[in-house]
């Protein structure tokens, strides 16, 4: 049942009291839980997110639309639907490009590790070294990608794919918005750990529980929306060449 909205559009009835639909002061981490139909919008958007590729693109577009709504002063999540696909293409493409580069580098290291491991005991130490390097590279990439998450989302949307692919520009923007970038990274990191822990803990009891838990991913993106609103793409130009 649709939420009851006041005539001026500024208030909605939650069944017990009138709540504001406009931003009033600083938003907390769970700001969206006091907005109309938030649970249904998160759940349906999460279901759409289960669709390979299309779901991920739509979720990114939904997050950027939520950012625009909060920036304009509306304390509300966007309705669920597929209308955010176009908006989500840019950040998805940027992430895909960096992902392909990572796969190529890791693939070369994995192949080198396999070759040295099969060359006899004399090359086993080298193979272990390549394996360790590959692990450290994956760990570093994951941590850096968390730190650059806000920059990728905002820069790809505001500046376009071509400029957002530039790693020096992304790094400059992330450093210029250091507190925001770090907060987004920590929120997403904590959410990832929580999801992984719950998935492992419940997988032995409830089959496919990880899919059910992943339905809450839109809520994680909703948590970082206030930070995306505060992120400034004008804060820094691309770093000069060294």
What positions do the PLM features span?
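Signature of WW domains and closely related Tyr/Trp-rich beta-sheet microdomains
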Residues: 1-25
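Short, low-complexity cationic-aromatic patches
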Residues: 4-7, 75-79
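Short, flexible beta-strand-to-coil junctions
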Residues: 7-8, 15-16, 50, 117-120, ...
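Short, small/hydrophobic-residue-rich motifs at membrane-helix boundaries and re-entrant hairpins
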Residues: 21-41, 45-71, 78, 82-145
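Interfacial aromatic "cap" segments that immediately flank transmembrane helices
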Residues: 28-48, 79-104, 146-197, 225, ...
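Selective recognition of hydrophobic, aromatic-rich stretches within alpha-helical transmembrane segments
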Residues: 49-71, 124-164, 192, 197-235
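Alpha-helix boundary/capping detector
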Residues: 111-118, 178-179, 196-200
């Amino acid at each position: 049942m649709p939420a009851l909205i006041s005539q001026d559009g500024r208030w909605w009835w939650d069944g017990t009291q009138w709540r504001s639909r406009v931003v009033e002061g600083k938003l907390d981490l769970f700001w969206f839980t006091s907005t109309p139909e938030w649970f249904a919008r998160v759940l349906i958007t999460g279901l759409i997110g289960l669709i390979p590729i299309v779901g991920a693109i739509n979720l990114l577009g939904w997050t950027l639309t939520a950012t625009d709504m909060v920036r304009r002063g509306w304390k509300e999540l966007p309705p669920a639907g597929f209308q955010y696909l176009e908006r989500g293409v840019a950040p998805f493409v940027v992430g895909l490009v960096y992902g392909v580069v990572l796969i190529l580098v890791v693939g070369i290291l994995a192949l080198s590790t396999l070759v040295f491991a099969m060359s006899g005991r004399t090359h086993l130490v080298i193979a272990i070294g390549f394996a360790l390097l590959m692990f450290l590279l994956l760990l570093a990439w994951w941590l850096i990608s968390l730190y650059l998450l806000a920059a990728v989302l905002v820069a790809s949307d505001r500046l376009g794919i071509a400029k957002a692919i530039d790693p020096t520009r992304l790094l400059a923007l992330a450093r210029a918005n250091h507190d925001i970038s770090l907060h987004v990274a920590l929120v997403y990191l904590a959410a990832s750990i929580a999801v992984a822990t719950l998935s492992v803990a419940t997988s032995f009891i409830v089959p496919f529980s990880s899919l059910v838990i992943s339905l809450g991913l839109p809520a994680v993106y909703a948590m970082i929306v206030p930070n995306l609103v505060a992120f400034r793409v004008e804060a820094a130009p691309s770093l000069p060449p060294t």
